[in-house]
């Protein structure tokens, strides 16, 4: 059950009760594509860095190790030893962006595995079946993510097909949740708004899917090449047409500034690979902006990455030491940077929730954005 606790302007402070625990929103979901966050991060670590929700990928887990194997082992939560909510994306984005030789038809998509080249078919029913086998807390509907440079005619046809696929997802999810051997009979389903950069197509699609009584609504197809200004314009157009009493999820976004701007526009679920990907390359977030620990100026820097930060890296190690590890290609350096970045994001979300509770989010947002422009 989703409870809207407070609003400041369009910004939402809410709570989603799930079978795997409570999600306080706005929330940043930590991305563990193949049931692990890249950077040697364990589920024990995730507890320590204040992770509420882990996100895994349907396509990748279907290809390897196989969703039927995970089901036989009791579902994804048992498989990875994680006792909090998991969201699985539908696999659609990977099918359309990674897979070669794809062929889109009304029934679904034919494509070749990126691992062994074998031919795979995935449609709405197959995506729901895979996610049901995984037993995630939240399943995402199967959709097509049209390119931001696709023609208006193509985008409209794609969105219409995505709407038809969404109804099939909903029907199949209801069937799967009623089966005796299902891993999670309380699995939630989020639909996805598409429409590339065409505001009117997105608005019409948002209004259509809002009538389908889903558990949550995502905005997909952003952060794939359009400018930040275009993204914010689309959010301004679309979010008012989605139910305020349901989760609003902006997929694949983004930077701390993106998140702050999107929260102010009514979004309360986020995910992005930035904190872990940047961390693996020595780029770490601070309240004064992002820094590159490979830079020579940190060679003798005995300070933690961020003064006052309580992450495992900042509590115990200096910038100079972590820089040394990165230069020596020691895995610990990468791991410490990833842990710090995820902790930074999770802590920022905590601060956003506190600011909304206190009715001072706009002030917090402006102060945070101004601070991140500073040089360190």
Residue ranges with predicted function:
Residues 1-183, 296-299:
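Non-catalytic, usually N-terminal nucleic-acid engagement modules in DNA/RNA processing proteins
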Residues 163, 172, 176, 184, ...:
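Glycine-rich phosphate/ribose-binding loops and adjacent secondary-structure elements
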Residues 121, 125, 152, 156-163, ...:
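Non-membrane alpha-helical structural segments and their capping/turn regions in soluble enzymes
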Residues 21, 54, 89, 131, ...:
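Conserved, mostly hydrophobic/aromatic
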Residues 172-182, 246, 352-364:
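Surface-exposed helix-capping loop/turn segments at secondary-structure junctions
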Residues 147-152, 156, 216-222, 331-334:
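Glycine- and acidic
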Residues 21, 162-169, 209, 238, ...:
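Hydrophobic alpha-helical packing residues
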Residues 1-15, 23-32, 39-40, 143-149, ...:
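C-terminal extensions of enzymes
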């Amino acid at each position: 059950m989703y409870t809207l606790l407070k609003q400041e302007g369009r910004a939402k402070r809410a709570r989603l009760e799930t079978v795997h625990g409570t999600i306080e929103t706005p929330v940043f979901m930590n991305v563990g594509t193949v049931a692990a966050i890249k950077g040697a991060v364990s589920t024990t670590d995730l507890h320590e860095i204040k992770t509420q929700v882990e996100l895994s990928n349907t396509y990748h887990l279907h290809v390897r190790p196989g969703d039927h194997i995970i089901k036989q082992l009791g579902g994804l939560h048992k498989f990875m030893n994680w006792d909090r909510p998991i969201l699985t994306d539908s696999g659609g984005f990977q099918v359309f962006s990674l897979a070669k030789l794809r062929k889109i038809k009304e029934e679904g998509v034919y494509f070749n595995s990126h691992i062994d080249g074998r031919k795979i078919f995935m449609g709405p029913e197959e995506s729901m079946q895979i996610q049901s086998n995984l037993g995630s807390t939240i399943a995402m509907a199967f959709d097509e993510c049209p390119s931001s440079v696709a023609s208006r005619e193509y985008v409209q046809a794609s969105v219409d097909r995505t709407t038809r696929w969404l109804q099939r997802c909903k029907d199949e999810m209801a069937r799967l949740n009623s089966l005796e051997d299902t891993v999670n009979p309380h699995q939630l389903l989020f639909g996805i708004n598409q429409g590339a950069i065409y505001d009117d197509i997105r608005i019409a699609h948002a209004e259509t899917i809002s009538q389908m009584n889903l558990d949550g609504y995502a905005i997909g197809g952003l952060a794939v090449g359009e400018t930040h200004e275009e993204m914010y314009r689309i959010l301004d157009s679309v979010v008012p047409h989605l139910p305020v009493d349901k989760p609003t999820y902006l997929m694949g976004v983004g930077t701390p500034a993106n998140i702050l701007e999107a929260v102010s526009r009514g979004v309360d679920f986020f995910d992005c690979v930035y904190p872990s990907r940047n961390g693996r390359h020595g780029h770490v977030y601070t309240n004064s902006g992002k820094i590159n620990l490979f830079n020579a100026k940190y060679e003798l820097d005995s300070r933690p990455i961020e003064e006052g930060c309580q992450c495992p890296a900042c509590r115990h190690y200096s910038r100079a030491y972590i820089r040394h590890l990165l230069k020596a290609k020691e895995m610990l350096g990468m791991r410490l940077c990833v842990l710090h970045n995820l902790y930074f994001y999770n802590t920022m979300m905590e601060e956003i929730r506190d600011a909304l509770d206190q009715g001072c989010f706009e002030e917090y947002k402006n102060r945070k954005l101004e601070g991140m422009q500073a040089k360190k």
